[in-house]
Amino acid sequence: MSGNTFGTLFAVTNFGESHGPAIGCVIDGCPPGMPLSEADIQTDLDRRRPGSSRHVTQRNEPDAVEILSGIYQGQTTGTPIALLIRNTDQRSKDYSRSAESFRPGHADYSYWRKYGIRDPRGGGRSSARLTAPTVAAGAVAKKWLALQYGTRFRACMTQLGELPIPFEHWDHVRNNPFFAPVADVAQYEQYIDALRKAGDSCGARIRVQATGMPVGLGEPLYDKLDADIAYALMGLNAVKGVEIGAGFASVAQRGTVHGDTMTPQGFRSNYAGGVLGGISTGQDLELSIAIKPTSSILSPSASIDIHGHSIEVSTKGRHDPCVGIRATPIAEALLALVVMDHALRHRAQCADVVLPLPPIPAAPA
């Protein structure tokens, strides 16, 4: 396959390019009978929308979603759901000099070597613009999981460049443009303003969480839940690392600490991040992703053109000084898509499993 479809039973096919007429996706496998409207999807799209603050790209796309199929009388029918988002604010002239040059850190060179042709306008198919359909599909998955299991998804930024962001409360995340769990974001605004003025960019660390998780999701050996989570999140533009639970901090832990001990009252900790043996435990899914600095910067960089000549590249156009800012709702969506797919797979195989012991409560947050 050509890598444009994600999922097994809840399958999402993504289509479009950054500067094409439209982008979108087709969802196949959504259970019938779920109430669904464009408003259910638009809320999450508005959270990742470009032009939403002065700290992100000023490409001003409304990202208004259109449901083309799969809905009748306000409910899913069980047939493919086609979602369309029209591109309305392309500025292709900004990329007129990019057709024969390779921007360092971008997919220009690798796409050209693979296909022998590439769309230089805004990165074409490799653009983060293509995460909008992912967020739209994730909103559908989120709604079904919330109705079926009470599962909720949330994410926040925990580091901006070299600045760690302390966790204060989840309520702060929706009240600032950084999706930061703090009340005061003045220092982060100053940091981004200085980066933009210097023609530079930075990376970010994003924490992602799913609460109200059902037990038993995951298909060993090769479709483990945590393996599929890592696979999905590594598919997000600019992600260079995924941690689940304690992640790399596990190296310095002792077994007496890392093992999530259990009592009749519940788990005492969640260093595993809600997954054991590739199967969900019912504890919260806890993970973090590392996002590299934005490759599109005003500062000149050495590169070559398609003829092999040395050139200097300075990227024009409208770009995010930190793509991690808008990655938060995208990471939520990808996690929701993985959980949704595994929930349907688990229900198909193990719906009749009955045990005498109820699920063990999760450790206190």
Curated annotation (Swiss-Prot):
GO annotations under biological process?
Answer: amino acid biosynthetic process; aromatic amino acid family biosynthetic process; chorismate biosynthetic process
Recorded GO cellular component terms are: cytosol
Positions contributing to FMN binding: 125-127, 237-238, 277, 292-296, 318
Write out the residues that bind NADP(+).
Answer: 48, 54
EC number(s): the record gives: 4.2.3.5
What does the record give under GO molecular function?
Answer: chorismate synthase activity; FMN binding
Q: How is the cofactor bound?
A: Reduced FMN (FMNH(2)).
Could you tell me what reaction this enzyme catalyses?
5-O-(1-carboxyvinyl)-3-phosphoshikimate = chorismate + phosphate
Respond yes or no to whether keyword NADP is given for this record: yes
| Zinc among keywords | no
Keyword vocabulary terms for this entry: Amino-acid biosynthesis, Aromatic amino acid biosynthesis, FAD, Flavoprotein, FMN, Lyase, NADP
Give the required cofactors.
Answer: FMNH2
Please name the pathway.
Metabolic intermediate biosynthesis; chorismate biosynthesis; chorismate from D-erythrose 4-phosphate and phosphoenolpyruvate: step 7/7
Q: What quaternary structure, including any partners, is listed in this protein's UniProt entry?
A: Homotetramer.
Report the family membership.
Belongs to the chorismate synthase family.
Write out the function statement from the record. Answer: This reaction introduces a second double bond into the aromatic ring system.
Name of this chain's protein: Chorismate synthase
Organism, per UniProt?
Verminephrobacter eiseniae (strain EF01-2)
Q: Which gene encodes it?
A: aroC
